[in-house]
């Protein structure tokens, strides 16, 4: 102690905070100066001091100490903004799903990391003595990333498969998580629980296998005499300085190291910290060191090849069991690390990139010939540098040069103005050979059904020559042109050939062709052709002879349109399968009649009305109620107006309410208050009790009325009703009490008491209530009475001329009650209930006879007068050749849909099979091109029918005073502007005919507020000129005289009006694809993506389509023009993803490497390097030597690569394992070779595993070439292929190993530790090693005899004894003679 005190006086006094790293350094220097005993004494004092201080400080942790970083809010906002922009780009087709995922993850990872860095500075500035800060940054408990989760943001998490979830947890644990965030973070928590349970056992098993492989490796010699070594250098950037120092310290040099002429270190010198610092200072050449790889032995190792012992810092002692130390050093951290489950966000990054920023504002210049355009990993456009590129940034008085290395991305253009701190280039981080990546497949699925088109050429993948898998050679879009396939089951034989033009009736409300399964083909044919085939019914033939004339079939009916005021617009609400167009009538009348509701016209999607269809309705506000209640019709019966067979269009709609037609002039509404409560609610009132207004029913609900409470418990909830009214306890003489559930009219006497009698003023409802069996009382409830008028006069609603019943179409007004008799009505809070609806019903039941049924087709006509545009609803009466085939109660049948199309010039072969005469029917429904498809299921023929029922159009008309403004609805219903449903191709929900878009030109001057009477018009229709394009790019001019008909598609056209005369900036040709938000006219960006089909002088027709971006190398599934269904796979991207550094994925990876399991994909860069290597080496060294040296170097390189892979996983978790431990393991698993078929069958059998050095030696001794292949044995296989069968049998497969050993007559020489432990012998390590040393010294003196009588004996001696100098890898053959007693050796020598 005196010596220590004396020395202490001379020591330097340091006053600074010591963290964990500084503590490690201090301890190592103390050991160097004072040795182990003194150091432990000093450290005891440090420990005591620490405990004293901690007790005195008494740091506690309160919730207020968790302070969120103030900059978090704007950082998260910024990241969200970036994500939003990214989402937009993905929607427009600028980036594909993989790029979006990558970028999204990097945005959030960067935000999270930045927040973590901010956290430390924030604590340091605001609260340096914060306990959380002190603990986490002292290294005592917790680390910054854990504290970051408490006060920063939790960030990105992995799912159970280890894939990153791209939805980050933005909250921290202090603020609390939302429900979604909680569920995502539960993944991590569950992972942690599973890891501790499962992975701990995995780690233990890993340790056991590792020790099994190397338990016999003991230090038995000082020097094996090898001259080989491994070169280490820190120059090429593959190794950081820290790793370089760790690799060198404790090693032994394999060669002298010179600095110029001067030798600064000699061979076999062990490397300490001073020597390493000298190497770094002098920037010495690559340094050759000895490693276990270069040792000439297999079953032991020499001191110099192992180096310093990690425990006491000197060269390792003889007899040290370094194998077991190595096995435990690798296995043990795994056991510790399973307790950590942290998720690093850099999963998708292939090495982070450095950014070069502009130092000041200025113009950038570079040589454009040295770069070529490309895409970055995030889908941004950039330039890739071929070679190092000099970039000049010029400001007014400064010129700045930047050198950008090759393979970097330049993110700006030549001569572009850049701002200060703008990122101008991204330097790729040098990815090392061993940065193993995996190839991941990402499938992109179609969002909608439609037809697939490519905007570039594609290649067939060679393995799928006859399949439908294609490879993309360059970046391009895949377009899914929207539309739906239709299948016909009734006509399984195909009458239409591919590319035939035909007329097809529109789809049903469901947009599916599902026919009645019960109808056979014969029935269909009979139905189709039993009606008059010549089609000569009165006025129903369309004449197409005139070039510019359409003669209509006489049945024209108009409904009064809206007057479009300035800034007003027609609005359509999409409801189920119909369109509702609210119609405004004259404003003065509107105020009188309908204070707050308008008339709505309801048109089916296919535009066809049947008999008794409702054309328009309006909801009278007089018949609205806010409260719940019961409707009663009194005693008069009613009948439902909507019969079962008329419900086809409503089938499948849950919200359908049948309407009841009234024959009565009044009905009654009995109000009641209803609350539907969850089953677990605590109800604060009793059943049958009487409460007042505003009584508390549950904790947060109060009653709105007073009265009797009835509670009814259902399966899942509780229904609580409150009946208002008087309670009446009946006397014996009371008449009312005998009745229950009846309405009593006013005027009836009500006996209140014996004395007075009173007459009722209003209707009342009497309800008898029996709380117990004997008692009962009567509740008298008030009733609201509604009178219904006989029908509103149509004149008040519509102008006079509508009411003239023209041409078979009649309109009548009907009032419907929307609720049936006695049905309780439940009012949802704040919405009113409409009790009565007034409807306008179409009547057309003149023709009762059989096969033909009347239909009314609705279409819109646009009329322009004096610059004002009006839309008229036009009704056409059409006779349908087929009535609906409907089987009652058959849910699958939605009826056969007739084709009432005119067969122009025999376009439709369906008719021509049966009749040579051409059938010309009125008003064809949907024209389309038919394309036969690859059938998905062979039983039904698939047809694709393009129909233009989804037309929309933009109207930039010049000189008009109306604007396309969508009014907001008060309830916020989604409103569809009706403009978008009108267009050159058709009518609102369907095409009545290809030319049903008319400009009605009139020669009479018409005033705005007057209605256009049809008789004033001369029926001259201007037909627009179009260009049509089919899939093959042929362009047609659809004259009436020719057969070409447009192929429209379901729901997917819209129209864009554009004045080409004024602005010819963009030339648009048919077939061109247009992305969303691209400006094609000066009126602003175009709002939908699609393909241009028709170019007109002032408009375009665009078929809507969705683009999907695909980059080169992506695989496209499906054929050009194939019909895709929603959810089909469109593209498969293959991208590289760095393996996760998470230990829970890390441990299996370590195990995967050590067990040498085949990984799904070899690292791309390693594959390329091996190919290049095989080409170059033989070229340099000539054929035989090149291949031999190449094979040797490949084995060496693969060993180093394995070591680096294992180190990488541990280093990512901050665990330091010395390379030499891993090298000992790797040496064992790479030291075997497999004898090939052509091998020496007289010595080794083919397929036998032998040691590499032993194979080489045997070949030299017998002067014959042995063919063998280097193999990597997994640690389990290596454990079962050792020299000792006892060791193998005690590991696994005991019976098999022992049986095999017995059959082969194997001898176990008990060299390892395990065999001796099993049999209770002395372990040949440590003190038990001295016997071995003594023996080996004697054997070293045996002379080598070359010439002997028996040559074979000499050769065998070569094989078996030369291993003293060149130790062979001799596992499988029992060649362990050097452990036998000495007499046997003498005998062998004398023979």
Curated annotation (Swiss-Prot):
One of its GO terms (cellular component) is DNA-directed RNA polymerase complex. Transmembrane segments: none annotated. It is found in: Plastid, Chloroplast. Coiled coil: none annotated. InterPro entries: DNA-dir_RpoC2_beta_pp (IPR012756), RNA_pol_beta''_euk (IPR050254), RNA_pol_Rpb1_3_sf (IPR042102), RNA_pol_Rpb1_4 (IPR007083), RNA_pol_Rpb1_5 (IPR007081), Rpb1_funnel_sf (IPR038120). PANTHER family: DNA-DIRECTED RNA POLYMERASE SUBUNIT BETA. GO terms for molecular function: DNA binding; DNA-directed RNA polymerase activity; zinc ion binding. The gene is rpoC2. Keywords: Chloroplast, DNA-directed RNA polymerase, Metal-binding, Nucleotidyltransferase, Plastid, Transcription, Transferase, Zinc. Its EC number is 2.7.7.6. Belongs to the RNA polymerase beta' chain family. RpoC2 subfamily. Signal peptide: none annotated. It catalyses: RNA(n) + a ribonucleoside 5'-triphosphate = RNA(n+1) + diphosphate. This is DNA-directed RNA polymerase subunit beta''. Disulfide bonds: none annotated. Its cofactor is Zn(2+). DNA-dependent RNA polymerase catalyzes the transcription of DNA into RNA using the four ribonucleoside triphosphates as substrates. In plastids the minimal PEP RNA polymerase catalytic core is composed of four subunits: alpha, beta, beta', and beta''. When a (nuclear-encoded) sigma factor is associated with the core the holoenzyme is formed, which can initiate transcription. SUPFAM superfamilies: beta and beta-prime subunits of DNA dependent RNA-polymerase. One of its GO terms (biological process) is DNA-templated transcription. Zn(2+) binds at residues 224, 295, 302, 305. It comes from the Eukaryota. Binds 1 Zn(2+) ion per subunit. CDD domains: RNAP_beta'_C (cd02655).
